[in-house]
UniProtKB/Swiss-Prot annotation:
Pfam families: Chitin_synth_1 (PF01644), Chitin_synth_1N (PF08407). It is found in: Cell membrane. This is Chitin synthase A. The keyword Transmembrane applies. Its EC number is 2.4.1.16.
Length: 915
């Protein structure tokens, strides 16, 4: 059952009965930590609202737009006709043909900030419910005769059009000036779809029109937070019975190509088809698509990939030449295109192609931001602008390039449906392996193992407690009401959107780094929300596939942002843990969250001391090999050599991280990766060799019994602790019925562990000053025409006029992605190449200087391992080293056991919950 905060009578989902409405929570059974009372105390600053109240029907009624159809029905399009044919102010439908009839009642009343801008409409003038209201496919603008006079009739005389002013650039044939009226300064147009596209999909027969025959364009001239107050609206609220949006899906993109975009959209389309196929569901079913809106938000008009934009045009969600730079002197901040598409996508050999889809349309919003303002600003448009209008139940966040499973979005939604206290959820993020081919790259295999282990141990553990430290922005979902701020303007979204202002002098460096992982801040704020009891859940049944870096330079840059953001966000969450006590969670839940924060603190401490811990383990193991019973002098020599190389490589990491670009130092970094792999192989050999020798010595002296495995200190400290960790990894993977990564990626991950600890951590902490997302500054976009106000409240717009012109424009867009794109080459500019050369020379000089002085000090002081060749060694040093080794390794084993128990609890709960 879906929770509809507006009170619409939506039924239950399948056989589940928990109600999402806080007034009906007594329908579920009580459970520990979930008493039968409201999941959120009454603290909603906004009363339930409607936008453009309409009669109770599902008919697409007239809306404050003007058609740019070539047919002269719109106000200002054919004044000769209007002078001789005065329309009836109250026709058989809701609106008159002449907007002046509604001018005073609808558009010129003084705006009162205390009242919702869409609530001042008189409903008394509307007729009673009619049978025709149930038809979705009715005119968007529909007077008695929706299109005015028949342009092909004998008595029709078309008014001459005004040619545009000549310009040096070639003028497109289809651009013709039309006059349209602005509503409260807002330019909104209904643009006809190209006949070439329209002929492939079901739609209203002429002269009718519907959401399939026209695309709606809005030129937003405001900040996202003011979108609702500036009286902008969306199609879903313009039906005679406004459509309830149960699922609002955001797809954010920057400059992703058409292949990545199509991969995501194909996954979204399949999920919508799946929900439409659930005919026995009381929430979904045949018309499920009417409750789902997909919003594609592109970060910057100059940044969008032209092939991706062409794919959107192929879907009917974009038309070239419609957008404006300014409206009435106000800069346009976002271009919003709305269309219900019935066109599908498919990928063949790395190429995108269109295919007709039947029975399951998709309501789409394409928001093309004028400027590049980063991903968090895109989410402001999604939540503050469009979410405020649509008032959805569940919001799903996707990155372009992430492909959700065919029913993954449904399973995410289901988690909210069965648990009224679920405020956020995420699925499993999988590495896209191309049928295993990418596993040949050790870097990809290592990341695959890392992702799998997180989904098997970390996420289930955190879900069992109710707080997941991060819901990945690439694929996650939130309950819209859980995100809302309180009446004082404080809450999850307020904290989340602070990240947009965290630049330069506006924020400290700690806060700026913290907001590199703003999704972690959002998770903490939801769980600790004042007077609420929201929880975060992991949904194993849901998954999304994504690409991972396959080159070292890209990998380092990605992890720099991840590591810095997650570390500082974890510090923030731990330092503000006390805010959990202001929430309305039960005492038991608060205690569980307290235990989880202790666990998070221990993890953070291990991350902070990661470099030191790894070096000490290396030093102790190599020192063991120098014993006379093991390798003797050979072990001592190898230990000193490896220790010098280890420290030299570590210093090189620091020098490169402080001054060099990873892309310009790729050879250095790859050399270090190979060295760390060699170190890991040597450590593995040392651990096994030391253990075997210690067991052999035990057998020769006293014989062998099973208890000797636990009394032999070296064996117990090394093999049992490490072995138990790896055995738990295998066991958990088999229990979760997902063990293949243990056979295909385990060795690669183990070999890359020193690289993760040393290279990535050093680069991240040496670049805490860099708070960028790795994107460059704005490119200059092509300047668009402006819409300037004329006497009478009208503006001139350039519009497509002719079926042939519309088809030509549509086919030109299709041609942009008809062929495979040229293979991308990373071309380094001459400036970057010269800068890399200078920095490389500087780093080489610094390294030679440091190593020469270090060698001099080591030789003079007999330090840095040279003392190993002396016969005078203290046994206490070995004792301390052994104790330290045991503490570190058993701590690792204990943490793994803790994760394992949490994962088992998650599976137990999942057996009864069904999600």
């Amino acid at each position: 059952m879906s929770y509809n905060r507006l009170g619409d009578p939506y039924g239950e989902e399948d056989s589940h009965t928990p109600m999402m409405n806080p007034h009906h929570l007594d329908a579920r059974s009580p459970s520990p930590g979930r008493p039968l009372n409201a999941y959120q105390l009454s603290d909603n600053p906004y009363a339930p609202r409607e936008h453009l109240e309409m009669p109770s029907s599902d008919r697409l009624a007239e809306q404050p737009t003007y058609s740019v159809e070539r047919l002269p029905n719109s106000y200002g399009h054919n004044e000769v006709y209007e002078d001789h044919h005065h329309p009836n102010a109250y026709p058989g439908y809701e609106y008159s043909l002449d907007p002046e009839a509604h001018h005073d009642a609808y558009y010129t009343q003084p705006y009162q900030p205390a009242v919702t801008p869409h609530e001042d409409y008189d409903l008394g003038q509307y007729p009673e419910h009619q049978q025709s209201y149930t038809d979705d496919r009715v005119p968007i603008l529909q007077p008695d005769n929706p299109f005015g006079p028949d342009p092909y009739a004998d008595e029709y005389e078309e008014e001459p059009t005004i040619a545009p002013t000549p310009s040096p650039a070639p003028v497109r044939r289809w651009k013709t000036v039309k006059e349209v009226q602005l509503f409260n300064g807002n330019l909104v147009l209904d643009c006809p779809i190209a006949p070439a596209l329209l002929s492939q999909v079901p739609h209203a027969e002429p002269p009718g029109r519907d959401e399939f025959t026209h695309m709606r364009y809005s030129a937003a001239t405001c900040d996202p937070a003011d979108f609702f107050e500036e009286r902008f609206t969306l199609r879903q609220k313009l039906f005679a019975k406004p459509r309830h949006t149960e699922l609002f899906i955001a797809v954010t993109m920057y400059n992703e190509d058409d292949f990545l975009f199509a991969r995501t959209m194909i996954g979204v389309f399949k999920n919508i088809e799946y929900m439409c196929s659930r005919t026995s569901s009381k929430t979904w079913g045949k018309d499920a698509w009417k409750k789902i809106v997909v919003c594609v938000i592109s970060d910057g008009r100059a940044k969008i990939n032209p092939r991706t934009r062409a794919v959107l045009a192929g879907l009917g969600c974009y038309q070239d030449g419609i957008a404006k730079q300014q409206v009435n002197g106000k800069d346009v901040t976002a271009h919003i295109y709305e269309y219900t598409t019935q066109v599908g996508l498919e990928l063949k050999g790395g190429q995108v192609s269109l295919k007709p889809r039947t029975g399951c349309p998709v309501q789409m919003i394409f928001c093309l931001k004028e400027k590049n303002q980063k991903k968090i600003n895109s989410h402001r448009w999604f939540f503050q602008a469009f979410g405020r209008v649509l008032d959805p139940n569940i919001c799903v966040l996707l990155d372009a390039g992430t492909r959700p499973g065919k029913d993954s979005i449904y399973h995410l939604w289901k988690a909210f449906d069965v648990d009224p206290m679920c405020g956020g959820a995420c699925g499993e993020i999988k590495v896209m392996l191309s049928h295993g081919k990418k596993l040949l790259n050790p870097l990809v295999a290592g990341q695959n193992f890392e992702y799998k282990l997180s989904n098997i141990l970390d996420k289930p553990l955190e879900s069992a407690f109710g707080f997941i430290s991060v819901l990945p922005g690439a694929f996650s979902a939130y309950r819209y009401v859980a995100l809302q701020n309180d009446k004082n303007g404080q809450g999850p979204l307020e904290r989340y959107f602070l990240g947009e202002k965290m630049h330069g002098a506006n924020a400290g460096i700690f806060t700026a780094n913290m907001y590199l992982a703003e999704d972690r801040i959002l998770c903490f704020e939801i769980v600790s929300k004042r007077n609420c009891r929201w929880l975060l859940r992991y949904v194993k049944s849901s998954n999304g596939e994504t690409d991972v870096p396959d080159r070292m330079a890209e990998f380092i840059l990605q992890r720099r942002r991840w590591l810095n953001g997650s570390f500082f966000a974890a510090v923030y969450a731990i330092a503000h843990f006390y805010q959990i006590w202001r929430s309305d969670h039960s005492f038991m839940r608060k205690f569980m969250l307290f235990i989880e924060f202790i666990y998070q603190t221990i993890n953070m401490l291990f991350a902070w001391f990661g470099i030191g811990n790894f070096f000490l383990v290396f030093h102790i193991l190599t020192a063991y090999l120098g014993d006379d019973d093991l390798l003797g002098t050979v072990g001592k020599v190898l230990g000193v050599v490896f220790e010098w190389l280890y420290l030299a490589t570590l210093v090189t990491c620091f020098v490169l991280a402080l001054g060099n670009r990873p892309g310009g130092s790729n050879k250095f970094y790859m050399t270090m990766v190979y060295f760390w792999i060699g170190i890991m192989i040597y450590l593995a050999f040392a651990a096994v060799f030391v253990t075997v020798k210690s067991i052999q010595s035990q057998v020769q002296q006293n014989g062998f019994t099973f208890s000797d495995l636990f009394t032999n200190y070296q064996f117990f400290s090394i093999i049992v602790s490490l072995g138990s960790t790896y055995v738990m990894w295998f066991l958990a993977s088999f229990i979760f019925m997902d063990p293949w990564h243990m056979f295909t990626s385990f060795i690669q991950y183990i070999l890359l562990t020193p690289t993760y600890i040393n290279v990535l951590n050093i680069y991240a902490f040496c670049n805490t000053h860099d708070i960028t997302w790795g994107t460059k500054g704005d490119d200059k976009a092509e300047k668009l025409p402006s819409a300037n106000l004329k006497p009478g409240g009208k503006v001139d717009v350039n519009i497509p006029q002719d079926d042939g012109d519309l088809n030509a424009q549509y086919e030109a867009e299709l041609a942009k992605f008809a062929n495979k794109p040229p293979k991308e080459e990373n071309i380094v500019s001459e400036e970057d190449r010269q800068a890399d050369y200078y920095k490389g020379f500087r780093s080489a000089v610094v390294l030679v200087w440091v190593f020469c002085n270090f060698a001099l000090a080591a030789v003079v002081l007999s330090a840095a391992g040279l003392e190993e060749f002396s016969s005078d060694q203290e046994t206490t040093e070995n004792t301390r080293a052994t104790i330290y080794m045991a503490v570190v390794l058993w701590s690792v084993a204990g943490l793994s056991l803790f994760k394992f128990l949490g994962a088992m609890w998650f599976l137990t709960v999942r057996m009864f919950r069904g999600v």
